[in-house]
Swiss-Prot record:
SUPFAM superfamilies named in the record: SAM/Pointed domain
Keyword annotations of the record: Developmental protein, DNA-binding, Isopeptide bond, Metal-binding, Nucleus, Phosphoprotein, Ubl conjugation, Zinc, Zinc-finger
Species in which this protein is naturally found: Homo sapiens (Human)
Chain positions with Phosphothreonine modification: 609, 614
GO biological process: negative regulation of DNA-templated transcription
Protein name per the record: Polyhomeotic-like protein 3
A Pfam family that the UniProt record links to this protein: zf-FCS_1
Length: 983
């Protein structure tokens, strides 16, 4: 624990920017508003007060808290003006406001409500922070330190010996300079911690104030931050507690005390505990609100592992978090956190508890801790003792006090983090302290958890914290798993987990705790019904350490999924029946600790990414405050029978206040259980890879967070048979062709039904091509090449479906032209008129025509078909339809000419018998086309409008320069032209 304060210090400044997002803290916006709003008006006074409080002995802490509160009142009055100035001095104001909020909130937190700060902060001032996150971070960081007794030492260092008498501006400047100096060392930790504070305190104000909120949160949670500075934004909530805990070497105790009760603060064990605990309490209160929103989700991740937590933490504060937790919070409401706030005023404190993952390495843990922070306030409810938590205390305590939080829907903040905290062992070293504290200061416990062990990596076990304690009433069912101590301290006992997992653990339980300290928390817990009203998800999920990962994953998922309304289709049919049950925590016995940690990390990550919604039923349940009820199905899948093997997941009762009783929490299954059930969760857990600790959920809408993107699955799978482009086309095409067929010949009466729609088909070449392709698919039967007799599938043939290759089509054209030369020559006028007027060259038309011709006697069509097939087989994708039509018309005309000329060595053609000088452009085209290897070049002659006279004047350089004809063909053409001249 001693080491934690230092980390916390360093962490203070780090998180500002990331925390900004945390602002999501809106969940507790009502409660927290007071904290933040006050800032702008009287920053200077607040700074002075803070400095004084920092430097004064613990005995005078109460006075300074009162002073802070008075300053806060002034701030509220000045709030409007201050807001205007906000952008200018937002960072300073934020930090000051954060400090004040934390201090004042600490006082209120003493009272069950801790409403004073919250009430006053109800205003949206939290926004102040946003303007200049960096300065705000620095300031808030220093403030946070000052606000928490644990941080006092750090604060003193930062502020130096600044006398309380310094002018506000001086103090601010000094703070800034110190912050800047401090930043390098504590950059990550300090800044981050600050941000978390901001988020918690400013959560009330608004997301835009995220930065401010974060700063406030950081400030209030600064102590916690110190321990787990890294997680900055998310961490803010937990940070407050964690900082408190970390800073107080005995912080666990002191922070616990502070959490339990402001009064206990004075009781806090040793050192700065008294002041720190006070600050902690304050911070917790303010941050709780803020944190609650962000933290409640992130907490889930915290338990997974610090890295996951970090991600979650950051994401909640940032857009990602938005996806994971924050999304849900905001969507469902940041209130999910609010849920934790469920007691309208107390919620803030309850959030504080959340998780405090800082137990993990400072950097990663910070993120988690912040996430957890939301739960921090709840920590008091965390009754699980560290040891117990190890076993499976981790309950997903997501008891959002529904009544209070505006966005109760998200109530379900599961904070499976606790679950994740499988690492009780790691925390065991720390745990002992927490355990003692636990018994001594159950109230403080939550705080202790927070501090607990920012240094600890992933002692998930503490995570257990959550559940049981929170619901005293619920505890009986679920807490039993936790342990007597849990039940005893149900309201406060988050401390056990404090150690490494504490961060994770913290998150969950804190959420449950309402703003009220232990008492309120107990009442909330005891009254899951009340919570459920608001959609309280207060449920303790005790998970064996092994399961922790699963719980964690679930928690994480929920948050990730939360963002989307996520109608979790999961019907917790089994559980819903027992409203009281929600508190019930099921202990998972099958999971192995080792599995848990890994899984927590992986699951969290994986869950977050691919199947967040599915990831864990609990997560889903939590994630969708609105749909939590739906989520009950998860429980159903798990089946209470499996309870022994499953950890109870926090299930939020439907938003409906009517659901007084909290639906039974979804069960978190141990690895074994989860795996067995994984089958039942069809698509929900697909990407999770059947992580052992996954709960079974059948959400209607699956939401995945992958690479930072939230991906929602559709209610129905995409059709696999064909590409989406082709699915609609057949209808269009068929009608198109049918129209043509019917118009030309009344074949296939069935097609006539579709004819009406055919005319409306778009003229784009793409559609024509698609239509033709679809036709080919429709005629998938084997086709026989009319020239070479080769058999093949329709898709391998040319568009005309008559020839397997272009060479066959061309050869067939030649043979047909010879066969029908005479008959065609006789009918030339008709054919030409057809080509000019009647025939439509569009691809689909050609295909339709060929289709019709195939069905008609072959006497007349064969030659034309031949031409059509050739035309169709050479699609010009880049040309417009009009151009293609005109080109095809000309091609047909020229072909007719060619056919007249070519058959019988062109002796039969009148053109051949005439002087080349009187040839028309078409005659020249036919002549060039008849030359070997010059078929493609013939079109160029027509495009250049070369008639007989021009042809005789052509030279190689003309062909090469004007028509880009290669030298070989140009020489051949010129040789033939010369022969014409000679003849």
């Amino acid at each position: 624990m001693d080491t934690e304060p230092n980390p916390g210090t360093s962490s203070v400044s780090t998180t500002t920017s990331s925390t900004t997002t945390t602002t999501i803290t809106t969940s507790s916006s009502r409660m927290q508003q007071p904290q933040i709003s006050v800032y702008s008006g009287s920053d200077r006074h607040a700074v002075q007060v803070i400095q004084q409080a920092l430097h004064r002995p613990p005995s005078s802490a109460a006075q300074y808290l009162q002073q802070m509160y008075a300053a806060q009142q002034q701030h509220l009055m000045l709030h409007t003006a201050a807001l205007q100035q906000q952008h200018l001095s937002s960072s300073q104001l934020q930090s000051l406001a954060a400090v004040q909020a934390s201090l004042s909130s600490g006082r209120p937190s003493t009272s069950p409500t801790g409403s004073v700060t919250q009430q006053s902060s109800m205003s949206q001032t939290s926004i102040n922070l946003s303007t200049s996150p960096t300065p705000a971070q620095l300031i808030s960081r220093s403030q946070a330190s000052s606000s928490t007794s644990g941080s006092i030492t750090q604060q003193t260092m930062l502020l130096g010996s600044t006398s309380p008498t310094l002018t506000a501006s001086q103090a601010q400047m000094y703070l800034r300079a110190q912050m800047l100096i401090f930043t390098p060392a504590t950059t990550v930790a300090a800044v981050q911690s600050d941000i978390p504070v901001v988020s918690s305190s400013s959560s009330s104000s608004c997301q835009s104030a995220a930065t401010q909120v974060q700063n406030l949160t950081l400030r209030s949670q600064k102590l916690g931050v110190l321990s787990s500075s890294q997680n900055g934004p998310p961490k803010s909530t937990s940070q407050t507690q964690s900082l408190t805990i970390c800073h107080n070497k005995t912080t666990v105790t002191s922070s616990k005390i502070s959490q339990r009760d402001p009064s206990p603060e004075s009781n806090k064990k040793g050192e700065s505990p008294s002041l720190e605990s006070r600050s902690t309490a304050v911070t917790r209160t303010s941050s709780i609100h803020q944190l609650i929103a962000p933290a409640s989700y992130s907490p889930i991740q915290p338990h997974s592992l610090i890295k996951h937590q970090q991600i979650p933490l950051h994401s909640p504060p940032s857009k990602v978090s938005h996806h994971q937790l924050i999304l849900q919070q905001q969507q469902q409401q940041i209130q999910p956190i609010t849920l934790q706030n469920s007691t309208q005023d107390p919620p803030p404190s309850q959030h504080c508890i959340p998780l405090q993952n800082h137990g993990l390495p400072p950097a990663p843990s910070n993120a988690q801790s912040q996430h957890c922070s939301p739960i921090q306030s709840h920590p008091s409810p965390l009754t699980v003792s560290p040891n117990q938590s190890q076993s499976a205390q981790q309950s997903v305590v997501v008891s959002p006090p529904p009544p209070h939080s505006p966005s109760q829907s998200p109530t379900i903040i599961i904070h499976p983090q606790a679950l994740i905290q499988p690492h009780p062992l790691v925390s065991s070293a720390l745990q002992p302290g927490p355990n003692l504290q636990q018994s001594t200061a159950n109230q403080v416990q939550a705080t202790a958890q927070l501090n607990l062990p920012s240094h600890l990596p992933l002692p998930a076990s503490p995570v257990v914290h959550i559940g049981p304690v929170q619901q005293s009433a619920l505890v009986s069912p679920g807490q039993q798993i936790v342990s007597p101590s849990h039940q005893q301290y149900s309201s406060l006992q988050s401390s056990p987990i404090p150690i490494a997992s504490p961060p994770q653990m913290s998150t969950s339980p804190p959420a449950q705790i309402p703003p009220l300290p232990l008492q309120s928390m107990q009442s909330l817990q005891v009254q899951p019904e009340i919570l459920s009203q608001g959609q309280v998800l207060v449920q303790n999920a005790l998970v064996s350490e092994e399961e922790l990962p699963a719980a964690e994953a679930l928690v994480q998922l929920p948050f990730q999924t939360l963002p989307p309304p996520q109608t979790v289709a999961v019907n917790l049919q089994v559980q819903p029946p027992a409203p009281v049950d929600p508190p019930v925590v099921y202990q998972v016995e099958d999971v192995c600790e080792e599995e848990m940690p890994e899984e927590s990390d992986e699951c969290v990550r994986m869950d977050r990414t691919p199947p967040p919604p599915t990831l864990s039923p609990a997560a889903i349940t939590v994630g969708r405050g609105e749909d939590l009820t739906s989520e009950h199905p998860l429980l159903e899948q798990v089946e209470l029978p499996a309870v022994a093997s499953v950890s109870a997941s926090v299930i939020k009762s439907p938003s409906d206040p009517s659901h007084v009783s909290v639906p039974p929490p979804p069960l978190l299954l141990p690895a074994a259980t989860t795996r067995s059930n994984s089958t039942s969760m069809h698509s929900s857990i697909p990407s999770i890879e059947n992580k052992p600790p996954q709960a079974i959920v059948k959400p209607q809408i699956l939401t995945h967070v992958i690479e930072g993107f939230v991906i929602q699955e559709g209610l129905e799978p995409f059709p696999v048979s064909r590409s989406s482009l082709l699915i609609e086309q057949p209808v269009k095409k068929r009608p198109l062709l049918d129209n043509q067929v019917i118009n030309s010949v009344c074949v296939q009466p069935e097609l006539q039904n579709n004819t009406k729609h055919a005319d409306n088909s778009s003229d784009t070449e793409m559609e024509d091509m698609i239509a033709e392709e679809t036709l080919e698919e429709m005629d998938s039967e084997l086709l026989k090449c009319e020239f070479c007799g080769k058999m093949g599938y329709a898709n391998e043939f040319l568009r005309s479906k008559r020839f397997c290759t272009m060479s066959c089509a061309k050869r067939y054209n030649v043979s047909c032209s010879k066969k029908f030369a005479l008959s065609r020559w006789n009918r030339k006028p008709d054919n030409q008129s057809l080509g000019h007027r009647g025939r439509r060259p569009s691809g689909p038309d050609g295909a339709a025509r060929e289709h019709i011709l195939r069905q008609l006697p072959i006497t007349y069509p064969s030659a034309e078909e031949d031409l059509a097939s050739h035309e169709d087989s050479v699609p010009s994708a880049m040309t417009t339809r009009l151009r293609r039509q005109s080109e095809r018309e000309r091609e047909r005309e020229l072909r007719d000419v060619r056919i007249r000329k070519m058959p019988e060595n062109s002796d039969l053609l009148p053109v051949a018998q005439t002087e080349p000088s009187i040839w028309t452009v078409d005659d020249v085209w036919a002549f060039i086309h008849s030359l070997p290897g010059c078929q493609d070049i013939a079109d160029e002659f027509r495009a250049q409008e070369i008639d007989g006279q021009a042809l005789l004047l052509l030279k190689e350089d003309h062909l090469m320069s004007a028509m880009n004809i290669k030298l070989g063909p140009a020489l051949k053409i010129c040789a033939r032209i010369n022969s014409l001249k000679e003849s």
